[in-house]
């Protein structure tokens, strides 16, 4: 096992781009080892300690903190991690306002904060979330994740605050058209169909997830999306 001093020595000797790639690979393969997520964080933080304006490391570390928040125990820890993820994304926006991932991961972490606090306690966040989603798609019209973000927003909001299952489904379909193997979007589409009691359509979306080959985000698929799809299949069986 590497000592901390040995790790630091290796990191300071490595090329920044190689470090970013290594950290990215650890994150994308975190389903293979429970320690990879933390290791990814350490490497991205090392890059930023040497190069605080590294745009790739900023948005990627924001993504890492979103995942760290998702798996944290207790709302206090979750919120602290999402807040730091949002801060990192905001730093990127200030460096390069035209980087779509800065806006996207600011939105994701802000949205997670809202989900953790509860929708009714977070309605004041909605204009900011919409603004960041709109800007993400202005900068990258093919951003499937932003389409999922719009769909999730319309899915989760109560009707009096602008929620709409029809709009949610429309946005989820747009995202799937852009990236058919982005497994989370198909799960979210199925959940919207279930809420509308459109069970045959939900079943079809879930079958696609369960049988998906070469998902865009393998770790998300294995750790979250396929298990949730299987769970939802059981819940609506016979309906």
Roles of regions detected by a PLM:
Residues 35-39, 72-87, 120-132, 160-174, ...:
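Structural signature of tandem alpha-helical TPR/SEL1-like repeats
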Residues 42-49, 87-94, 134-138, 173-177, ...:
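Conserved structural position within tetratricopeptide repeats
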């Amino acid at each position: 096992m590497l000592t901390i001093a040995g790790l630091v020595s290796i990191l300071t000797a490595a090329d920044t781009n190689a470090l970013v790639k290594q950290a990215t690979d650890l994150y994308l393969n975190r389903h293979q080892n429970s320690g990879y997520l933390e290791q990814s964080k350490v490497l991205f933080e090392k890059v930023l300690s040497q190069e605080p304006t590294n745009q790739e490391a900023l948005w990627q570390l924001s993504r890492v903190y979103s995942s760290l928040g998702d798996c944290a125990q207790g709302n206090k820890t979750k919120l602290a991690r999402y807040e730091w993820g949002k801060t990192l994304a905001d730093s990127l926006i200030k460096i390069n306002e035209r980087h779509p991932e800065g806006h996207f991961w600011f939105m994701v972490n802000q949205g997670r904060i809202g989900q953790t606090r509860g929708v009714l306690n977070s309605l004041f966040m909605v204009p900011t979330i919409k603004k960041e989603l709109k800007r993400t798609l202005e900068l990258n019209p093919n951003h499937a994740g932003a389409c999922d973000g719009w769909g999730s927003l319309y899915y989760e909001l109560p009707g009096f605050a602008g929620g709409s299952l029809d709009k949610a489904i429309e946005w989820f379909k747009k995202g799937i058209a852009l990236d058919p193997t982005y497994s989370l979007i198909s799960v979210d589409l199925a959940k919207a169909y279930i809420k509308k009691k459109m069970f045959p359509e939900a079943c079809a979306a879930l079958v696609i997830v369960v049988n998906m080959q070469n998902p865009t985000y393998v770790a998300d698929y294995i750790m979250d999306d396929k298990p949730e799809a299987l769970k939802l299949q059981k819940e609506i069986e016979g309906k």
